[in-house]
Every structure is written in C-alpha cells, then in structure tokens.
Amino acid sequence: MSELYDILVETPPTKVILLALDQGLWDCERSLNELAALCEANHMEAVASVTQKRQTPETGIVLGSGKLEEAAAAAGELGAECAVFDGELTGSQIRNISTALGGMEVIDRTMLILEIFRSRAVTNEGKLQTELALLRYRLPRLQGMGESLSRQGGGGGGGGGARRGAGETKLELDRRHVHARIDALAEKLAEMEQRRGESRKARAKTGMPVVSLVGYTNVGKSSLMNALCGPSVAEADMLFATLDPTSRKLVLPSGMAVLLVDTVGFVSRLPHNLVEAFKSTLEEAAWSDVIVRVADAGDDQREEQLAVTDEVLDGLDCADIPRLTVYNKCDKPNALNFDPDILLTSAKTGYGLDALLKKLDELLSDRVHTIRVLLPYDKLGLAAPMRERGSVQVEEYREDGLYLEGIVKTEDLHCFEGYLV
C-alpha cells in the first residue's frame, strides 16, 4: 500500500495551458493567477497562458482563430495535454475549441472547481452536494454534445436521419436520467438539512456560543483553528482544503466555552451551482454569534477576497452578526501593518492568538456572568450549566454545601436564583 501511495504522490502534474477572454470586467492577470492556483490544487501545472482582449466573444470559439492557433502551438511545444478556460463555456463552445486545438481536452473554470470539490469531499453530504452541482452543470451542456451522441448512438443501416434520431433518443434518455438523479439528490440533501437543523437546535440548547471562521480558500482557517484548539483538522497549503464544516470546542481566557466552526472557503466568481449546492454548509455562518473574517496578510488581493466573503455572507442573511477581521499568516515576509481594528495573527508562530481570544471574549461579554454560589448537597445537579456551558474556577466542598465560583451564560443565570452569595 505504501509503495502504491509513493507512486501516486510522485505522479507529475498534468501540464495545461490557460485561455482567457479579457473584456475588462475584472483584473485578467489576477484571475489567471487564481486559475493557475486552482489548477495546482487539482494536480495540474499551468505552463502557459493565452489571453485576448476583445469586447465580444468570437461566435462558437470565444477567442479568435488566430489566438487558438497560438494556443495550439504553445501547447504542442510545452507538452500541454489540456486547455483550461478562465470562465464558463457552453457544451458546443467546449467542443469547438477542442477541435480548434487539435482534439485537446478542454475544461472551463467552473468544471475545474467542481472537480476540486469532487476530489476533496469527505462526508456523505459533501459528496452528494458535489454530485448535485456537477449534474446541474452538465445538464444544459448535454445538447452541446448532441453530434457526438448521434455518432455514438447511430445504427448500422439507414441514412443520416436514422443516426440523428438515435442520437436524439439517447440525448433524451441522458436528460431524463440526469433529471431523476438531481431530484433524488435534492431529496436526500433536504433530509440531511432537516437533520442539520435538528443538530443546530440541540446545539442551541447547550447554550454554547458559535464562532465561525470564514474567508477565502487557502488563507489558513484550518491552521488557525488547530493553533487555537489543538491539532485535529486537516491542513494543506492549497485551495479548498476544507469542504465540510468542522466544529471544535474552544475555551476563551474568561473561561467561557465556545464552538469554533471552520467553514468551506470562498473563491471569486464561485460557480452559482456550487453556492446553491453548498448553501446548507455555508449557512453554518448564519447561525453564529460572531463571524471571524480571515484573510492572508501577505496577499495583495486580500481586500478583494474579503469583499467576496462579505458578498456571500450578505446572501446568507448574516448582516446583523458581529464580524471580526483577522489577517492571518502575518509571519510571511510581505505582510504589512494594517488598520488597528484588524487583528494580525500567525497560526504558524502563535503571534496574535492571545489578542484574538481576548477580542472574542469582549464581543461575547454580554453572554456570560461571573458568579459565586453555594449549592445545598441535595441540589448539586444545578451545577451542570456552569460545568457544561461555562467554567468552574473555584470549587470547595463546605459543611453547608458546594461552593462554586465561575462563569455562566446569561440564559443560565436563573438556574442559580436563591443560591447566589
């Protein structure tokens, strides 16, 4: 098994060439840099890029024929096996561009991200969400593959009309199959969401405040969680290392226990199908008491990344939830000084973690109270809220009862009425 693992690890990445149409709608260079990082996350190496500035796409092939000839030549010279387009393509555009590139495989940005999600999903829900997104992506593109379906589905006798009819029948069968699978997946995910809602209610009963780490993918959210709570969450210096939400208990300096949630990372122009498919996962942030927006201190695109994060959060009705901004990875050489309202942290060195914990305590201060109580020995069960949802700082067994000093949540204060000292 280890030998097979070593072989798989040493497999060289697939060489790809990047294609882009620059219509002036966004920073094309930055977008291509992000696309190259996405390729790396999918075990691909971008060896060249071809960009064309034009306001309107070329009919059928998006880029001009001259640019595609340039791309084909570069791919042949550099050994690229696949072309990745920085945008979304229709089925017919994929086929036409592939033909212009001599039959080379062509995928678009959305398909690349979907493939990354497919390979990274761990839980059953994550896998189902990814499959649903893939099917919704492929459904409108089945028509674009009509000609190849016709060639594959045509019979031996008869003319072209018979072959086209067979192809159309296969296309309709494909559509029905995809629609049926989409409906089945949606039903399963709805059941899972109902169970997730029940879990949230159970979690709410514990009274433990929820703090969600949100932000662009690969900014170190999982590393930050591990630095705060101790190693447990998988870390990787790559895009979309975390797809399924992970929850850990964290005790703040005040003694208050909170639930820290690591969420799926965002990316600019995240495909709509993915936003919809992973909405239940992203909605973990909407149930938070505090949202920690995490960015990479050394990334000059951090402000744009936070804007993407806020855009997604605003769509999840998180506007009224307090937000805290953290620039992680401040140990990197190109990290700079920032606004004093922004916390600088390094999950690697531990810098700034104490300040982050203190700030969380401040934001959640109205949720807890420090109290002293004396519980009769026949009422020791009343100590449970302090033990389970707060913290016990002093515990003494006295002649007349159990003396406790500690922190309790505001909603648990009524449990100790009549026993405060």
Regions found by a protein language model. Name each.
Residues 1-17, 140-219, 225-226, 230, ...:
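C-terminal-of-GTPase-core extension/linker across diverse P-loop GTPases
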Residues 2-4, 196, 202-209, 227-259, ...:
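Switch I (effector-binding) loop of TRAFAC-class P-loop GTPase G-domains
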Residues 2-8, 29-33, 56-73, 242-245, ...:
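Switch II of P-loop NTPase G domains
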Residues 10-11, 75-77, 242, 250-254, ...:
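Conserved catalytic network of the ASCE P-loop NTPase/AAA+ motor domain
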Residues 22-26, 54, 58-61, 88-91, ...:
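Conserved Switch II/interswitch segment of TRAFAC-class P-loop GTPases
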Residues 110-114, 239-240, 347-349:
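Short, acidic/turn-prone active-site loops that include or flank metal/cofactor-
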